[in-house]
Amino acid sequence: MNKPLILVVEDDAPVRSLITTTLRAHDYRFLSAANGESAILEASSHNPDIMLLDLGLPDLDGVEGIHRVRTWSNLPIIVI
């Protein structure tokens, strides 16, 4: 069985790298996005199983991102 596809949304590159490196070490499948608009695009294009979301994004407030995703998906979101 495949592990879940995780979308990591974090604008701070070292933090994003730490998270994705950890996921890779445990053989998780993941996508990453550095801003809110990219996150929305990745989520709608790839239908991840869960999203790890930074609330302090430069282009789109994380809460607004959650509201936008909720208009078309029940994707589980964990705020980081």
Indicate where each model-derived feature is located:
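Short hydrophobic/Thr-rich beta-strand motif most characteristic of the beta2 strand and flanking loop
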Residues: 27-34, 42
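Active-site beta3 strand of CheY-like receiver
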Residues: 46-52, 57
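Conserved phosphotransfer cores of two-component systems
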Residues: 44-46, 68-75
